[in-house]
């Protein structure tokens, strides 16, 4: 991956390892979409578009030679720069266990938020429809734990009618889930009751959405396609600091909208 130019950076192997490990730790907790969608790839930096398996016919009916264009989703290329203090990084070699990587950490969070934004809300300029775009798959839900359980049962009933198998996952706004937990009554925890309704699925809380959705995790319905997975490269040196960047190429495809139900509170 020469485009990352890591060998040109004034950083030691230990420093690179610390940077990569810290970024990986944050990505693991902040990439909410990857917790329940299928991840394909990575196919490499040169992978520019993902084929959709269709042809848009553009020739006239009376033409002898018919022709068209293969449909595809172009990959989104993101790049976010940040700077780290070289003296502080050298402290790592001196034995300091907690060097300041706050600039890296903040950039990682913004990149994770961008990827999730595409998954949940789409990106019109790149032809991506996000999960929340399918308003026709919406059901209303009240504000009590009982209302939530009833909405999940209704969602699973719709899945059953459409032939969508499980397991199923509830993706819900973190604050809304906390409020449901505050209002629960009885000796049997709400979390257990929801998990039983989901038939072996799980609950994912996230600040990325305002309401909730129930999705099937049978596989093949929602695809995050990676060209170059999240990587860190070297950009330049600025006196006593080093300028690095995070990059990724990806797109997202909702193959089957019938595998999701939006819950609106």
From Swiss-Prot:
Q: How does activity depend on pH?
A: Optimum pH for protease activity is 7.1. Nanocompartments are stable from pH 4-12, they reversibly disassemble at pH 1 and pH 13.
The UniProt note on how this protein's activity is regulated states: Proteolysis activated by calcium and cobalt.
Q: What is the effect of changing residue 187 to K/R?
A: Makes normal nanocompartments, pore size increases up to 4.0 A, slightly increased Cl(-) flux
Where are the disulfide bridges? Answer: none
| Temperature-activity profile | Optimum temperature for protease activity is 90-93 degrees Celsius.
One GO CC annotation, please?
encapsulin nanocompartment
Task: Identify the EC number(s).
Answer: 3.4.-.-
The segments labelled Pore-forming loop in the record are 184-189
**What are the protein's UniProt keywords?**
Encapsulin nanocompartment, Flavoprotein, FMN, Hydrolase, Ion transport, Iron, Iron storage, Iron transport, Protease, Transport
A Gene Ontology molecular-function term?
peptidase activity
Q: Which family does it belong to?
A: Belongs to the encapsulin family. Family 1 subfamily.
What does this protein do, in the record's words?
Shell component of a type 1 encapsulin nanocompartment. Assembles into proteinaceous shells 23-24 nm in diameter with 2-2.5 nm thick walls. Cargo protein Flp (ferritin-like protein, probably stores iron) is targeted to the interior via its C-terminal extension; empty intact shells can be isolated in the absence of cargo protein. Fe(2+) may be able to pass though the 5-fold and dimer channels in the protein shell.
Question: Which protein is depicted?
Answer: Type 1 encapsulin shell protein
Please name the source species: Thermotoga maritima (strain ATCC 43589 / DSM 3109 / JCM 10099 / NBRC 100826 / MSB8)
Q: Tell me the lineage of the source organism.
A: Bacteria, Thermotogati, Thermotogota, Thermotogae, Thermotogales
